[in-house]
């Protein structure tokens, strides 16, 4: 008498998500992009997965941690692209990012370590621009020298207009101060995008400036700008 072959273990999508450490939504996305397919479906239409499905999810996660896109992962897993070639190209991208990040680190170190150095808040646009380049994987356009100079001029005008508001007793949330804050927010957004660290950078530079004034920016003016920007939080860009 032949013994029945035991049925292989099957997992529902929620069970697979828990076993592999991802969300159900992520598994649905993997299916949508062709990276994962259900082994079978129940009569009720529920997706079922097997052991190989779990292994595939772990492989996808490993490649994602290396920084590969889902498109690249699919090509590698389907064999249409050599994984070695993908790794080599990705290494080249990482080396470029490391070089950019190292340059940014050196700039920030020069601005903060040397206690005798004059840290100019007017350099903020250039600093944020460098940060944006260092963190962006694909840079489609670069700021020319003329554009950088134009932005620095705008930043100085913002400083002067803000100083006039503060010296004139204008409340940080007053109409004139708001108009200047809108211009400041727009300029910062052009350079850094939706980066939550902008406020942090402003506060750090304000602390570094005490007790001296840096290119016309002092802690009081920095705080005034911070309050004016805070008054715009509920307003759209």
Swiss-Prot record:
The gene is nolA. One of its GO terms (biological process) is regulation of DNA-templated transcription. The keyword Transmembrane does not apply. It comes from Bradyrhizobium diazoefficiens (strain JCM 10833 / BCRC 13528 / IAM 13628 / NBRC 14792 / USDA 110). Residues 10-79 form the HTH merR-type domain. InterPro entries: DNA-bd_dom_put_sf, MerR-type_HTH_dom, MerR_fam. Involved in genotype-specific nodulation of soybeans. Keywords: DNA-binding, Nitrogen fixation, Nodulation. It comes from the Bacteria. SMART domains: HTH_MERR. This is Nodulation protein NolA.
């Amino acid at each position: 008498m032949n013994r029945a072959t035991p049925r292989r273990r099957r997992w529902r999508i929620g069970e697979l998500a828990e076993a592999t450490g991802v969300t159900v939504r992520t598994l649905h996305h993997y299916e949508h992009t062709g990276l994962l397919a259900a082994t079978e479906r129940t009569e009720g239409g529920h997706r079922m997965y097997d052991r190989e499905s779990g292994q595939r999810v772990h492989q996808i996660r490993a490649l994602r941690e290396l920084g590969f896109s889902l498109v690249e992962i699919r090509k590698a897993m389907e064999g249409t692209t050599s994984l070695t070639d993908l790794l080599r190209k990705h290494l080249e991208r990482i080396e470029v990012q490391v070089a950019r990040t190292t340059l940014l680190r050196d700039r920030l170190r020069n601005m903060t370590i040397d206690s005798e150095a004059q840290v100019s808040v007017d350099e903020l646009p250039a600093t944020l621009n460098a940060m944006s380049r260092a963190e962006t994987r694909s840079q489609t356009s670069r700021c020319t020298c003329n554009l950088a100079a134009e932005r620095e001029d705008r930043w100085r005008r913002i400083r002067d207009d803000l100083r006039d508001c503060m010296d004139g007793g204008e409340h940080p949330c007053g109409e004139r101060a708001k108009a200047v804050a809108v211009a400041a927010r727009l300029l910062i957004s052009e350079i850094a995008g939706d980066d939550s660290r902008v406020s942090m950078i402003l506060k750090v530079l304000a602390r570094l400036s005490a007790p001296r004034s840096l290119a016309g920016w002092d802690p009081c003016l920095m705080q005034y700008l911070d309050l004016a920007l805070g008054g715009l939080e509920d307003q759209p860009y």
